[in-house]
Amino acid sequence: MHRYLLFGQDARAEKAVMANAGWYTFLKDINYPYGVKDMPISEDRLKWFLSVKGAIMLGDEDTDPNDGSLRNDKGAKEQGNNRFQRGIRYFERNVLIADSLDMPFRWRLQVVKNAAHENSKMIQAAAPFLLEDT
């Protein structure tokens, strides 16, 4: 979801849930897919991306570094050992970027208790966020 928001051609989303991604595209000067070096992202798009009402949702038990669906190449491992670590680092990095641009940051970090890489638990956690007023 975060890559769609960052690189997509429309700006209609009012809210977005980004849950348990295996790796992230950081707003750093490193090559895609782990960064945005040489990628066509306008300043307006970057500001819109950071101002969307978003939620990074992470299962507190999604910590298996050997999960079969977890990307484990060098670029991914530099983000953290597991989905939980990677998500926290991605959120924290975006907080710093929004602060450096002196702009509002409307994302939240939500840790889902007793959840590993389980879609059903993430959907239950996402529903209240998606249904609340923007």
Predicted regions and their residues:
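Short, flexible loop/turn elements at secondary-structure junctions
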Residues: 5, 20-23, 60, 111-116
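Surface-exposed acidic, glycine-flexible loop patches that form ligand/cofactor-binding
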Residues: 7-10, 43-48, 99-101, 134
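The feature captures the conserved acid-bearing segment of alpha/beta-hydrolase catalytic domains
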Residues: 14-96
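Residue-level recognition of the N-termini of beta-strands and the immediately preceding loop/turn
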Residues: 13-14, 52, 103-108
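C-terminal catalytic histidine-bearing segment of alpha/beta-hydrolase fold enzymes
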Residues: 91-134
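Short glycine-enriched nucleophile-adjacent loop
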Residues: 1-9, 124-127
